[in-house]
Amino acid sequence: MKINPTTSVPGVSTLEKENLGRISQIIGPVLDVAFPPGKMPNIYNALVVKGQDTAGQQINVTCEVQQLLGNNRVRAVAMSATDGLTRGMEVIDTGTALSVPVGGATLGRIFNVLGEPVDNLGPVDTRTTSPIHKSAPAFIQLDTKLSIFETGIKVVDLLAPYRRGGKIGLFGGAGVGKTVLIMELINNIAKAHGGVSVFGGVGERTREGNDLYMEMKESGVINEQNLAESKVALVYGQMNEPPGARMRVGLTALTMAEYFRDVNEQDVLLFIDNIFRFVQAGSEVSALLGRMPSAVGYQPTLSTEMGTLQERITSTKEGSITSIQAVYVPADDLTDPAPATTFAHLDATTVLSRGLAAKGIYPAVDPLDSTSTMLQPRIVGEEHYETAQRVKQTLQRYNELQDIIAILGLDELSEEDRLTVARARKIERFLSQPFFVAEVFTGSPGKYVGLAETIRGFKLILSGELDGLPEQAFYLVGNIDEATAKATNLEMESKLKK
């Protein structure tokens, strides 16, 4: 049987000879479908229900086969609302898994789980599609070299460097700058690495998805005039969608990222916001399919589902997918099975701090809480490792002295501690940086700081060479030369005022 892609239902191929079944049971988003003997669809096949509801409205629902029940029946999970479906309706077996558009045509566009554009900008070129279910790259295809993925953001590159082809957890509450950090990373990978990004919105608020899209257009990450010049493709399966869509939208985004890596041989950034919602959707589907729940009501297949997704995110000889995943921690309980399973896959964590955001230090990355497995002398080199450790020690000592300063004041500290505090405050400010994507809001041009420049700057602060400069000279600058130039300007300004 020949498969010919169709444009009627993006993301699904139809067969010239249709294999028809009928709905025998509907329980929420789960359908049981009876097929003729010997015509059973395979697991993960896409089924399409077309017809009219009782009000005469056209229905077009795509489902994915999850279980073969026996007696020629299969159980499938719907990718959209099942309102209006009735028993006895015809179901078409497409004979293949869900497939979505991939390649340059996806840039600057917003898709749903089926690969259908939802941004009202017309159809997408569906000549190149790819199934969302694939096996992870084989061992021989993997690139095992440990290399740093330079982001151009000082605090990240120095204290919690990302691994090329690694997975990073992004922790932070509302309003501490997650979105701006994400957009800056998208911008920097495009400029410094010639790479592209894919953003998977998994089970988050529709408003946030809309805000992100608008901000991307405003900051130039998405180019409305010429979509091909955009740096990102967006895939959304929001909170209000059925669990099937939320469970699979991460795979849709990953499939688009894999094409850029394997065929275009690019470095790709894959954002998943939020990985917890992927687990949550899997838990809902698992219960609907009648599986026995495991700890805290999660699905028994939790580790398998997480592993299947995460193992496809890796570096191969062709290119890399570096993934940044926002992690929601339910009730701040890090031992909850969902975040605990996620942590096992992470190479680095970037923790955003409300305290730093309140001080106006952006990016508000917590230098002491953020960690990385890459921060080892044999990987990053002795100079980088030593500088990072000394920066952390200085900041840690400053934290310990905060209580004494609050009660007794700075004058009660020893000479050595006062020097530590002065340097720590300079370091804290030097960890801030103007972003390219924030130019439109702040008016100050963004800065990309290379790793060597970052290390040089912090070494100079730690050595005491810059002790005479005022701490505000280090705030929102790029490299250390800009800080010294800013100090000279501040000095001249103060003289003029006098």
Swiss-Prot record:
| Any one annotated GO CC term | proton-transporting ATP synthase complex
- Compartmental location: Plastid, Chloroplast thylakoid membrane
Residue positions binding ATP: G172, G173, A174, G175, V176, G177, K178, T179
Gene encoding the protein? atpB
Q: Which UniProt keywords apply?
A: ATP synthesis, ATP-binding, CF(1), Chloroplast, Hydrogen ion transport, Ion transport, Membrane, Nucleotide-binding, Plastid, Thylakoid, Translocase, Transport
Its main subcellular localisation, reduced to a broad class, is plastid
What is its quaternary makeup?
F-type ATPases have 2 components, CF(1) - the catalytic core - and CF(0) - the membrane proton channel. CF(1) has five subunits: alpha(3), beta(3), gamma(1), delta(1), epsilon(1). CF(0) has four main subunits: a(1), b(1), b'(1) and c(9-12).
UniProt source species: Gossypium barbadense (Sea Island cotton)
Name the domain of life: Eukaryota
GO: which molecular function terms?
ATP binding; ATP hydrolysis activity; proton-transporting ATP synthase activity, rotational mechanism
Task: Look up keyword Ion transport and say if it applies.
Answer: yes
Q: What residue intervals traverse the membrane?
A: none
- Enzyme Commission designation: 7.1.2.2
Q: Which reaction does it catalyse?
A: ATP + H2O + 4 H(+)(in) = ADP + phosphate + 5 H(+)(out)
Its membrane topology: Peripheral membrane protein
Q: Which family does it belong to?
A: Belongs to the ATPase alpha/beta chains family.
What this protein is called in its record is ATP synthase subunit beta, chloroplastic
